[in-house]
Amino acid sequence: PGDIWDAVSNLLILYRHVPSVIAGPVYIGHIDRLLDPFVKDEEEARHAIRIFLTHVDRTISDSFCHADIGPYDTKAGRIILELSAQMQRPVPNMSLIYNEHTTDEFACKAIETGLVTAKPSFVNDAMYTADWGREYAIVSCYNALPIGGGGLTLGRLNMKKLGDVAESREHFLDHLLPAAVAAQCEQMDKRDTYILEQGRFL
């Protein structure tokens, strides 16, 4: 991309072509890192990022969609926090990767934003890095997945429905839950087989 407009346009085009369990990507990236190199004029960047966030909210109509920011204090990150507080849109959901590199000022800005719009959530980077290594992302609440793949296995299971039809605790644990888990695993395998082997998306 040559400028901030190219950057947001390219991301929005890319999001339309990601296979997903929702109407768009589950994870839209560390958006501050993706956009910060193109923030030259802050007012122009604010305008472009506002359009970007509005487009994501209006076209990926599912709060399963998630963005990460941080840990570093960037111009793009500050603009994203400022606009999130102003716009108060539910999508994308957002997390701040928090570690020793996160400045107090940036963390406080995130807290102020969270008090207005209930995002971003704070992520203990040290804990997730211990489990996943450096190349992870937080997607859809607190699910961690490796960057570059893994969202294919995200599915939804309505546990309440299982409870509603359970005849007893034993029926739930011994029959319904194992059958539901087996169905989820089969669905994941079929999705992965189609996208990775038959559809050749990646």
Can you describe what each PLM-predicted range is?
Residues 1-202:
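Conserved catalytic cores of very large enzyme subunits
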